Regions:
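Non-heme di-metal
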Residues: 1-156
């Protein structure tokens, strides 16, 4: 009839974005620079905001990115015993317009979610995985806020 397995058997399954812990640690190192670049970009975007309400939203996102940077640095140090060298002092690329900046920020947040999901699958169970889950939900919240700002500004 049907091929069946005892209730305790589970066929092996690996998500396509699963990576090793070593790969996750390398991506954490990259994430530090990514969060720093986002922070610099958002500083430029804040200056272009048409009003203080929108500037405050972006400032809140920027401040979250600073916190993410610190958490990623701590995770990297905890896993490797080494500190990540200071992020480069490069300047943020110029923002051509407020709307284009919002679009770029929105896409950047979505890309971060994809990268961080891979890191999440490479981390062991526990506080680091839980912390990264918080960062992922922050990035989703940021994407939602940028989407809201885009809709608001494009409908005017």
């Amino acid at each position: 009839m049907y091929l069946s397995y005892p209730y305790y058997y589970r066929s092996p399954f690996t998500p396509i974005w699963a990576i090793s812990t070593i790969e996750a640690i390398e991506l954490i190192k990259e994430a530090v620079q990514g969060e720093r670049n986002d922070e610099l970009f958002y500083d430029s975007l804040i200056k272009l905001a048409p009003n203080s309400y929108q500037a405050e939203i972006i400032e809140g996102i920027r401040n979250d990115e600073r916190g993410h940077n610190q958490m990623f640095r701590q995770m990297y140090t905890d896993f490797t015993g080494q500190k990540i060298m200071e992020a480069s002092n490069e300047k943020a690329e110029p923002v051509e317009s407020y709307i284009l900046g919002l679009q770029k920020a929105f896409q950047g947040e979505l890309a971060a979610i994809e990268k961080y999901r891979s890191i999440w699958f490479g981390l062991p169970q526990g506080i680091y995985k839980d912390t990264l889950w918080g960062i992922i939900t922050d990035e989703q919240k940021h994407a939602d806020k940028y989407n809201n700002l885009l809709i608001y500004n494009l409908s005017r």
